[in-house]
Amino acid sequence: MTVKRMDNVGIVVEDIDAAIEFFTELGLDLEGRAPVEGDWADGVTGLRDMRVEIAMMRTPDGHGRLELSRFLTPPAVADHRNAPVNALGYLRVMFAVDDIDETLERLFKRGAQLVGEVVQYKRRVSALLHPRA
């Protein structure tokens, strides 16, 4: 078996509209929105009577996608938003941008916060945005 590509990364959100606005402001495109439910969805996730609203966001180059999910039933359970960066599990998604300062300025207006600081690393500027953003 050969992996063809990474299809998407899933993020569970409380407010799907706010998440769409945030990632649109970052530069991703909304590919589509849809409800997800039924026996097939229950089977894939292992959750009974699952109902989720999803939005698929695509990077401008078309090579990466984020699946934003808002659980209607069962409700979302664990809250990892304040977990430290060394906690187990999914904690970050990184994007390459043309202008880090301009991008951060736009995202700060949407409530984003830096976890640390903007630093220079191998001729690339990197920053961590707080996951509550």
Residue ranges and their predicted role:
Residues 1-20, 29-32, 89-97:
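N-terminal beta-strand motif that seeds the catalytic metal site of vicinal oxygen chelate
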Residues 2-6, 36-66:
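C-terminal "cap" of GNAT-fold acetyltransferases
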